[in-house]
């Protein structure tokens, strides 16, 4: 669950050697023939990265972004790489930045996900719970207020102009949230579903619980590509719905797939399965340190400040010092309680 600022920073990173087609809101990196990795240009709030998989007749889109406006912008920019219609949408999991554009596709394409995604969207009041609650309802107004203060204190016209652009995007993003109607998938599966896009096989796999209770891995066996959503990112994922021990096991199953490129829901494509092993280590270490602090009756809010996972900063440069997202540590404590029952 990432903010506009993170999207803007990622947009500024050097491009890979793959060809890139840039639209207004999204840029499409060609991974192989007919497979494009879509990331934000920074011109609007978009949410997760997306993938476009082009078949003989139509297109499969992985995840739908953080709002209907983001989904419409994606479809408009998609015209730069294909004129084929979107026939399938896959939600890798239920979090807002991967599903809040679903309503744009409803009735026009099959929206497919693990059966838990339908349950979550229909039953969990997703616009009033985490991660939407903090990432959108709290952080966006706070960001808008902070930008207004920074504009008032800006010392030069160039800085003020840049801040005003950020403010405009943040305010537009806030307004775009008002349009959201949580829309569940109309097609679900439990373990595996295979789609044939005409000469291109796409497997939808539930390898086990992890980031959430219903994570889908999109696997292209011929192209040796996986799209892992937030089950495996190239950075540290949000953990507020995690099943920690199972996550490690599920990642082990992911490593057994014959793939060469991972297209994650956030971050950048990667090829080294060693990054998955590093994240498994991060999870084990977080679980151990969290359990030790819990035994000392340290509250989750304090534990989130104390855990030290800097041993993994080489693999995950976002780690700048001790500490972890408090929502993840709260979930870790909750998860430990669940295991006692």
Give residue ranges: language-model regions.
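C-terminal regulatory/interaction regions
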Residues: 295-341
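Divalent-metal (often Zn2+) His-rich catalytic cores of metallo-beta-lactamase-fold enzymes
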Residues: 110, 245-298, 302
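Active-site-proximal loop/helix segments of hydrolase catalytic cores
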Residues: 201-257
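Sec-dependent N-terminal signal peptides
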Residues: 4-12
């Amino acid at each position: 669950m990432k903010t506009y600022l993170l999207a803007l920073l990622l947009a500024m990173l050097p491009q890979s050697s793959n060809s890139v087609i840039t639209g207004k809101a999204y840029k499409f990196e060609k991974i192989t023939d007919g497979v494009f990795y879509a990331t934000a240009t920074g011109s609007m709030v978009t949410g997760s990265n997306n993938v476009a998989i082009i078949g003989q007749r139509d297109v499969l889109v992985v995840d739908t972004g953080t709002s209907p406006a983001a989904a419409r912008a994606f479809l408009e920019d998609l015209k730069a790489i294909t004129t084929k219609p979107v026939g399938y949408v896959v939600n890798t999991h239920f979090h807002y930045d991967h599903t809040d554009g679903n309503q744009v596709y409803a009735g026009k394409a099959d929206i497919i996900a693990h059966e838990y995604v339908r349950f979550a969207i229909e039953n969990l009041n997703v616009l009033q719970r985490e991660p939407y609650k903090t990432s959108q309802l709290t952080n966006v107004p706070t960001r808008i207020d902070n930008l207004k203060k920074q504009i008032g204190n800006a010392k030069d016209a160039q800085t003020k102009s840049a801040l005003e652009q950020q403010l405009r995007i943040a305010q537009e993003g806030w307004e775009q949230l008002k349009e959201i109607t949580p829309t569940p998938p109309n097609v679900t599966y439990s373990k595996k579903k295979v789609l044939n896009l005409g000469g291109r096989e796409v497997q939808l796999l539930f390898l086990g619980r992890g980031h959430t209770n219903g994570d889908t891995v999109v696997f292209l066996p011929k192209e040796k590509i996986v799209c892992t959503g937030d089950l495996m990112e190239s950075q540290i994922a949000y953990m507020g719905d995690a099943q920690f021990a199972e996550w490690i096991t599920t990642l082990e199953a992911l490593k057994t797939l014959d793939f060469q490129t991972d297209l994650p829901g956030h971050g950048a494509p990667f090829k080294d399965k060693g990054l998955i092993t590093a994240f498994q280590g991060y999870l084990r270490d977080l679980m151990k340190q969290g359990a030790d602090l819990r035994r000392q009756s340290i509250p989750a809010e304090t534990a989130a400040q104390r855990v030290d996972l800097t041993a993994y900063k080489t693999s995950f440069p976002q780690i700048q010092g001790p500490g972890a997202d408090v929502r993840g540590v709260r979930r870790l404590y909750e998860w430990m309680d669940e295991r006692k029952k």
